[in-house]
Amino acid sequence: MDTTESAESAHNPARPPSRSRCPPSAQPGSEGFWRPWVRTPGEKEKRTGPRAAEALPSGPGMAEASGKLLQYQHPVRLFWPKSKCYDYLYQEAETLLKNFPIQATISFYEDSDSEDEIEGLACENQSN
């Protein structure tokens, strides 16, 4: 902001002062926000430190006493066949949520071995 601009904004209260033009990542204070997908240097040391082997005696991804897996690489995506989307909604949702974190995204995929196709093939084989 040059001196004429600062003088104008001081005399004209209706005109707000101009903002800095630095990019959003370089603005002061933005480094304080926690982003789960960005690892801090402290987290990297925790995972690679000497106690990492003690924390995971059975190997990475093994279940602990509560039955949940120990480590995840976020964001977590769970792939679920489209033919079983109602199974997820009604029957297996409780089991799925017990075994996986709530911050997981369920991605449906087209499965070629759906029950409808299997039943159709079975009917064709019986008629031949």
UniProtKB/Swiss-Prot annotation:
Q: What is its main location?
A: nucleus
The protein depicted here goes by the name Protein ripply2
Q: What tissues contain this protein?
A: Expressed in the embryonic anterior presomitic mesoderm. First expressed in S-I at 8.5 dpc, where expression is maintained until 13.5 dpc, with an additional stripe of expression sometimes seen in the rostral part of S0 and S-I.
State the UniProt keywords alphabetically. Developmental protein, Nucleus
Q: What is known of its domains?
A: The ripply homology domain is required for transcriptional repression.
GO-annotated biological processes: axis specification; bone morphogenesis; determination of left/right symmetry; Notch signaling pathway; ossification; post-anal tail morphogenesis; regulation of gene expression; somite rostral/caudal axis specification
- Asked if Nucleus is a keyword of the record, the answer is yes
Q: Low complexity bias located where? A: 17-28
Report the superkingdom from the record: Eukaryota
Q: From which source organism is this entry? A: Mus musculus (Mouse)
InterPro entries from the UniProt entry? Ripply_fam
Signal peptide location in the record?
none
Induction cue: By MESP2, and acts in a negative feedback loop with MESP2, functioning negatively toward MESP2 to regulate NOTCH signaling in the anterior presomitic mesoderm.
Q: Give the span(s) annotated as Ripply homology domain.
A: 74-109
WRPW motif, short sequence motif: residues: 34-37
Q: Where is the protein found, in the record's own terms?
A: Nucleus
Q: What is one GO cellular-component annotation here?
A: nucleoplasm
